[in-house]
């Protein structure tokens, strides 16, 4: 249901700035995410920096192209582990 989908997305925002307890090894990450994560966690993010904007745009395009909701959620969970929390 829509309510269940909303709840699963809302859970991604809990403890957003906390360091993840478990890291997904780079080999196990989805290949579509291999080109994001240049701006490491804890660094200042700003869309006024061209490199930051390009990375955020690329991440958006990856998430937007997800095959279905479950694929989208998987990509979000994996990206949350290593992508800058401001992004």
Curated annotation (Swiss-Prot):
What tissues contain this protein? Hemolymph.
The UniProt entry, under Pfam families, shows: Hemocyanin_N
List keywords of the entry alphabetically.
Answer: Copper, Oxygen transport, Secreted, Transport
Cellular component terms (Gene Ontology): extracellular region
Q: Which family does it belong to?
A: Belongs to the tyrosinase family. Hemocyanin subfamily.
Instruction: State its role.
Output: Hemocyanins are copper-containing oxygen carriers occurring freely dissolved in the hemolymph of many mollusks and arthropods.
Question: Protein name, please?
Answer: Hemocyanin alpha chain
Naturally occurring in which organism (per UniProt): Tachypleus tridentatus (Japanese horseshoe crab)
């Amino acid at each position: 249901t829509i309510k269940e989908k909303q709840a699963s997305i809302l859970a991604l925002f809990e403890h957003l700035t906390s360091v993840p307890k478990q890291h997904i090894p780079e080999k196990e990450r989805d290949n579509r995410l291999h080109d994001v994560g240049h701006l490491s966690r804890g660094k200042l993010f700003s869309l006024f920096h061209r490199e930051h904007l390009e990375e955020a745009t690329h991440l958006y395009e990856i998430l937007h192209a997800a095959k279905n909701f479950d694929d989208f959620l998987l990509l979000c969970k994996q990206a949350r582990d290593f992508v800058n929390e401001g992004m």
